[in-house]
């Protein structure tokens, strides 16, 4: 009878070890996914910063062109 109890205990211990091993593998996969997502976030942040700078530059260019256009329209009205 004690041998049967020992076998059941051994089976439960082995099942616990298998579960722990699977969970460790899952944790490693999730860590890899997390790292990949972190890199994606950093890349997106860099792209966003570049787009913000480009947007500011384009706004400045628009202001310059609007001023030139107003000046030309003013000259045309004088004529």
Curated annotation (Swiss-Prot):
Keywords of the record: Cell cycle, Cell division, Coiled coil, Cytoplasm, Septation
Gene Ontology terms describing biological process: division septum assembly; FtsZ-dependent cytokinesis
Entries under HAMAP family matching the protein: ZapB
Assembly information from the UniProt record: Homodimer. The ends of the coiled-coil dimer bind to each other, forming polymers. Interacts with FtsZ.
Keyword Cell division included in the entry's annotation: yes
Keyword Coiled coil attributed: yes
The name this protein goes by in its record: Cell division protein ZapB
Annotated InterPro entries: Cell_div_ZapB
Family statement drawn from the similarity comment of this UniProt entry: Belongs to the ZapB family.
GO cellular component, one term: cytoplasm
Primary location group: cytoplasm
Coiled coil: 4-78
Subcellular location: Cytoplasm
Top-rank taxon: Bacteria
Function: Non-essential, abundant cell division factor that is required for proper Z-ring formation. It is recruited early to the divisome by direct interaction with FtsZ, stimulating Z-ring assembly and thereby promoting cell division earlier in the cell cycle. Its recruitment to the Z-ring requires functional FtsA or ZipA.
């Amino acid at each position: 009878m004690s041998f049967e109890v020992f076998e059941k205990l051994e089976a439960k211990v082995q099942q616990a070890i298998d579960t722990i091993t699977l969970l460790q593998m899952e944790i490693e996969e999730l860590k890899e996914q997390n790292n990949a997502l972190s890199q994606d976030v950093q890349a997106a942040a860099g792209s966003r910063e570049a787009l913000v700078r480009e947007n500011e530059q384009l706004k400045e260019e628009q202001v310059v062109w609007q001023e030139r256009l107003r000046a030309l329209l003013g000259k045309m009205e004088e004529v």
